[in-house]
């Protein structure tokens, strides 16, 4: 969920961890990973207007018996030791909770990449089959060293990531400015299947 008040853009996301592997320690590690990467982007300039960015992100473990309320702010991720399937939805999926490719979890924390998907971004790599029958991933041209194009823990968040998200948000709020009293649904911009990066 994204909102704009004056020149402040607030990006709000509650990430709820599910499954037997979900722990408070993981929740803290995931949240730190987001803030250490996405949280470094604190301003955004568009059409000569500079906006401040507030990252209102909370990662926690689901409470026992908690219902999965899909309200555009909550995102539910099942913690697994291997992501066996990919779901192209905004608010529900899987996330790896262990290390990968002989590296530790701290080196390969996948949360900032997965958070990019929550924000509506797509992968910037393609899967190819090699001569030995195994698969590898090739980063798309122009996306080297980017959080959406590299292996977990290797890419960085860049302003061009926001260029795929925030212009649409700003247009939304410019269009519906001063209409929230009669159209309260315009108060927030929700990322969904219609406005995700194609």
Stretch-by-stretch model annotation:
Residues 1-4, 67-68:
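Short, exposed beta-strand/loop patches in secreted or surface proteins that constitute
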Residues 17-20, 34, 125-126, 154-155:
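Solvent-exposed loop/turn segments at secondary-structure junctions
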Residues 3-29:
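Fold-level signature of zinc-dependent metallopeptidase catalytic domains
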């Amino acid at each position: 969920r994204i909102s704009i008040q004056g020149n402040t853009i607030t990006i709000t996301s509650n990430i709820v961890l599910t499954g037997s592997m979900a722990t408070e320690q993981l929740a803290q590690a995931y949240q730190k990973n987001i803030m250490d990467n996405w949280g470094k982007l604190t301003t955004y300039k568009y059409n000569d207007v500079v906006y401040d960015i507030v990252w209102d992100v909370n990662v926690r473990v689901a409470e026992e018996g908690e219902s999965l309320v899909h309200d555009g702010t909550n995102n539910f991720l099942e913690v697994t030791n291997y992501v066996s399937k990919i779901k192209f939805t905004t608010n529900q999926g899987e996330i790896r909770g262990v290390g990968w490719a002989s590296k530790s979890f701290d080196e390969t924390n996948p949360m900032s990449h997965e958070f990019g998907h929550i924000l509506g971004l797509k992968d910037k790599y393609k899967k190819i089959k090699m001569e030995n029958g195994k698969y590898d991933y090739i980063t798309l041209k122009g996306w080297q060293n980017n959080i959406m194009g590299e292996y977990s823990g290797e890419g960085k968040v860049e302003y061009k990531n926001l260029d795929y998200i925030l212009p649409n948000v700003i247009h939304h709020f410019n269009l519906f400015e001063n209409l929230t009293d009669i159209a309260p649904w315009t108060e927030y911009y929700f990322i969904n299947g219609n406005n995700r990066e194609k």
